[in-house]
């Protein structure tokens, strides 16, 4: 298990704009895409390469490419806002989807939709959700990824924008084998389980809804 909290001036600058209540949804989504792309530099470390032969205009030479398939799994709906940022770096990554809603009696996430590429059991998976609040939805989503195929993915990583210490701790305890990458770890959860100071409802701000 690895927790990586980014400390980068470009990410910090863009994140401050996302937090601003006056930032419109188009710019908000653009900033989320840009931060996701920047984060992929670190998320992509450690993936295996294989040697290939490439013909340049001058010669044939040895080169390297990513060895295994990649699948990104956004948690609906806010996770969709991070897909383009990953595709900017790994355009061949296939996309699975997980839809969850909260049971009003148990307050636990319940699956209402999931669909995954057949390459899940032969590649690396990155689960996407901008907000890691209580951690319940992310924990549920990762459990679904682990159980959907008889053969597990080679690796599973989680990538988010903001996290609360409570959610990070819960995720680490539930899935100690999953590396976690966050652009920022905020102060706490408030009494409504929103990340504080946060940036509001990420899904609403991405899609311009209320």
From Swiss-Prot:
Q: Which biological process annotations from GO are given for this protein?
A: UMP salvage; uracil salvage
Annotated SUPFAM superfamilies: PRTase-like (SSF53271)
What does the activity regulation annotation say?
Allosterically activated by GTP.
The UniProt catalytic activity note for this protein reads: UMP + diphosphate = 5-phospho-alpha-D-ribose 1-diphosphate + uracil
Recorded metabolic or biological pathway in which this protein acts: Pyrimidine metabolism; UMP biosynthesis via salvage pathway; UMP from uracil: step 1/1
What EC number(s) does this enzyme carry? Answer: 2.4.2.9
Query: Which positions are annotated as binding 5-phospho-alpha-D-ribose 1-diphosphate?
Result: 77, 102, 129-137, 201
According to the UniProt record, what class of enzyme is this?
Answer: transferase
What are the recorded GO MF terms, alphabetically?
A: GTP binding; magnesium ion binding; uracil phosphoribosyltransferase activity
CDD domains per the UniProt record, alphabetical: PRTases_typeI
What keyword terms does UniProt attach to this protein? Allosteric enzyme, Glycosyltransferase, GTP-binding, Magnesium, Nucleotide-binding, Transferase
| Residues holding uracil | 195, 200-202
Entry cofactors: Mg(2+)
Q: Which InterPro entries match?
A: PRibTrfase_dom (IPR000836), PRTase-like (IPR029057), Upp_B (IPR034332), UPRTase/APRTase (IPR050054), Ura_phspho_trans (IPR005765)
- How is the cofactor bound, as the UniProt entry phrases it? Binds 1 Mg(2+) ion per subunit. The magnesium is bound as Mg-PRPP.
Keyword Methyltransferase included in the entry's annotation? no
Any single Pfam family the record assigns to this protein: UPRTase
Please state which protein family the record places this protein in.
Belongs to the UPRTase family.
Q: What does this protein do?
A: Catalyzes the conversion of uracil and 5-phospho-alpha-D-ribose 1-diphosphate (PRPP) to UMP and diphosphate.
This chain belongs to which protein, by name? Answer: Uracil phosphoribosyltransferase
Instruction: Tell me which species this is from.
Output: Mycoplasmoides gallisepticum (strain R(low / passage 15 / clone 2))
Q: Which gene encodes it?
A: upp
């Amino acid at each position: 298990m690895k927790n990586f909290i980014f400390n980068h001036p470009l990410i910090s600058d863009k994140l401050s704009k996302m937090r601003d209540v006056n930032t419109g949804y188009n710019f908000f989504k653009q900033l989320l895409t840009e931060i996701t792309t920047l984060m992929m530099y670190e998320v992509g470390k450690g993936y295996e390469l294989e040697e290939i032969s490439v013909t340049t205009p001058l010669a044939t030479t040895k080169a390297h490419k990513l060895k295994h398939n990649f699948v990104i799994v956004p948690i609906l709906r806010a996770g969709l806002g991070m897909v383009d940022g990953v595709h900017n770096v790994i355009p061949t990554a296939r996309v699975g989807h997980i839809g969850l809603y909260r049971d009003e009696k148990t307050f636990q996430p319940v699956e209402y939709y999931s669909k995954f590429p057949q390459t899940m059991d032969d590649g690396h998976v990155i689960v996407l959700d901008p907000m890691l609040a209580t951690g319940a939805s992310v924990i549920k989503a990762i459990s679904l990824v682990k159980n959907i195929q008889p053969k597990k993915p080679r690796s599973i990583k989680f990538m988010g924008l903001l996290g609360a210490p409570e959610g990070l701790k819960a995720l680490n305890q539930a899935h100690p084998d999953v590396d976690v990458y966050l652009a920022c770890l905020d102060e706490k959860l408030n009494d409504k389980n929103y990340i504080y100071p946060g940036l509001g409802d990420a899904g609403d701000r991405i899609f311009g809804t209320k």
